[in-house]
UniProtKB/Swiss-Prot annotation:
The lineage of its organism: Eukaryota, Metazoa, Chordata, Craniata, Vertebrata. Belongs to the COPE family. Keywords: Cytoplasm, Cytoplasmic vesicle, ER-Golgi transport, Golgi apparatus, Membrane, Phosphoprotein, Protein transport, Transport, Ubl conjugation. This is Coatomer subunit epsilon. One of its GO terms (biological process) is protein transport. GO terms for molecular function: structural molecule activity. The modification Phosphoserine is found at residues 13, 45. It comes from Bos taurus (Bovine).
Amino acid sequence: MAPPAPGPASGGSGEVDELFDVKNAFYIGSYQQCINEAQRVKPSSPERDVERDVFLYRAYLAQRKYGVVLDEIKPSSAPELQAVRMFAEYLASDSRRDAIVAELDREMSRSVDVTNTTFLLMAASIYFYDQNPDAALRTLHQGDSLECMAMTVQILLKLDRLDLARKELKKMQDQDEDATLTQLATAWVSLAAGGEKLQDAYYIFQEMADKCSPTLLLLNGQAACHMAQGRWEAAEGVLQEALDKDSGHPETLINLVVLSQHLGKPPEVTNRYLSQLKDAHRSHPFIKEYRAKENDFDRLVLQYAPSA
């Protein structure tokens, strides 16, 4: 298992991180294990108590259990926990999202405590969900933690800026090349680079799954490597394993939509995965884009329909 990352996320002095198992489980997407570890560990200081709770509640968010976070984080809770609550409010209420973003804009225009890594991560997450990657990147660049850099890498790759993602990864490697987050970011960059790097990415995902747990994040990473190499049947096996773990996981369903098309499966198979995705994640960016394409197609059909 990788040693703990130095810096704000782990105390920064190179000593053994008492919250390493909590963080590591969260980073690889093993959210229930993260919750279990967080409830088991006894932190040595009030500051570490807050840090543990941050990961505990972020794991609940990842499980879409927004009510737990909203019920348990009080107005008197630490600023780091208030940031997690802000993200929970955003995720839980479609109708309040614009107001939450407007309030966040006002907060970002004032002096921001850049040592509050959790606030930077939650603010960047809100901006990214709100389809404002530029604001997300500006927010993350104010922090110097490995987690801020890892999220920066993810966003840059989604923007097809592999060149900038490589530079950010180099900064992570300089800080701690063995950290779990650095290894994951290395796999993401290798996957985006393609070619011979695909096998490197696959080995990272596979090794983490073997050492820790074959989580949905790691299984989808393996499947993406298989698909990029044209190994569709191998990808199907991995994605079925992921589907068995969670039949409503959005990335798994999206990958199965792509896979079904390439394997020439009947249209109803693809439509079934799309329907599951629409039911469970109607505001997912993929679904929003898919519906926009459907509307564009309908307009074109009307435009070229023969007049009576």
